[in-house]
Amino acid sequence: MADQRKSDVARGGGSLKFVILAFVGVGGLFGLNAMAYEAAYPMTAAGVCEIKTLPAGVLLEARSEGEYFRENNGLFRRLFEAIQKNQVPMTTPVEAGVRPGTMVFYLDPTSAKRTDLVLQGGVRRREVEERVVASIGIRGGYSKESFEENARKIREWIKTQPGWKPVGEPYVVYWNSPFMIWFLKRSEVHLPVHKG
């Protein structure tokens, strides 16, 4: 009887190890380890509004004539295909303009110097200079409603910051895979600003 219990415990422990390993594997597949990728700039904490400087960089950009929230899957697919085809390392975050719909992916420093990138499907390479944004950090699902609510909040917040003025339209910043569980997702809304 004691031998039977030991055998059951051993089998149970093995099952537990399998479940943990399976979860870790699924976590990797669905973006739970997204923060392991190289980040183009620091994340704004959830619920925080701040002004931050984004570095100059080289981007891959996909564009659409329609609004982003109608076209986002097509934009992500085109960018992902370009990343895979050119064997470019993944980075975070991905930025998305709303009207017209755009999605941009930051190239890592080594890939930014490459001259052999093959870009198709309307994906283009673009250089950006250092810029300043007002940012609000968000935790939760990626939706048009979340974007609109937080765009309103960051517009109201920047009015309380002496000397700072908006110089562009708000856009959304995604830190995690679209497949990540909604309540773990992190994002931001940025509003380009200038002091003067």
Task: Give names to the regions the model predicted.
Residues 2-196:
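A solvent-exposed interaction/effector surface
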